[in-house]
């Protein structure tokens, strides 16, 4: 199943970005050829379920010209940090390392960012988590809009709150990448809320 993620720098509309959230390389190639897709977020578990090696998929995406690929790492701090550095060294600036918003994930984000590695902090369910991720040096925060909605809260309101906080606090280095987006209306609403 593919999804579209949306991000926008609230200070510069020209930086609006669309990311695909899928492991389907044929679909990625199809949409990337439109010149409207700015990046891809991936999940190694989904890639492996398709019978492919995640690193082969990453290389195929880079060969297509995609230069912003969120590559998820898992484990404790040491595991995420070491794997994140390894992926960055192998794939260069095309690798944005995706970590969960957990204490170990935030610590890994901080250390990777110090090594100039771009990091996407995922599993954001509150403004407080987005603040911590920005403080840790994340390039992207990924609030899970659809999952927030599933739990009887307003995912778009979450994006709006994060956007307001980032704007008030002049946080410019961290972009909001709305995740778990399930339909076109939510993509539009996410952009309207500052993602």
Label every model-predicted segment:
Residues 1-15:
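Short, Lys/Arg-enriched N-terminal segments with co-localized hydrophobic residues
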Residues 142, 174, 191-195:
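Active-site capping/gating regions of soluble enzymes
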Residues 72-74, 98-100, 120-124, 177-179:
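Structural motif
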Residues 27-32, 83, 108, 126-136, ...:
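Catalytic cores of alpha/beta
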Residues 16-19, 24-28, 34-36, 41-114, ...:
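Active-site beta->alpha loop and helix N-cap motifs at the rims of alpha/beta catalytic domains
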Residues 123-158, 165:
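Histidine/lysine/aspartate-rich catalytic loop segments that bind and position anionic ligands
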Residues 59-69, 106-117, 155-176:
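Alpha-helix-loop-beta-strand connector modules within alpha/beta enzyme cores
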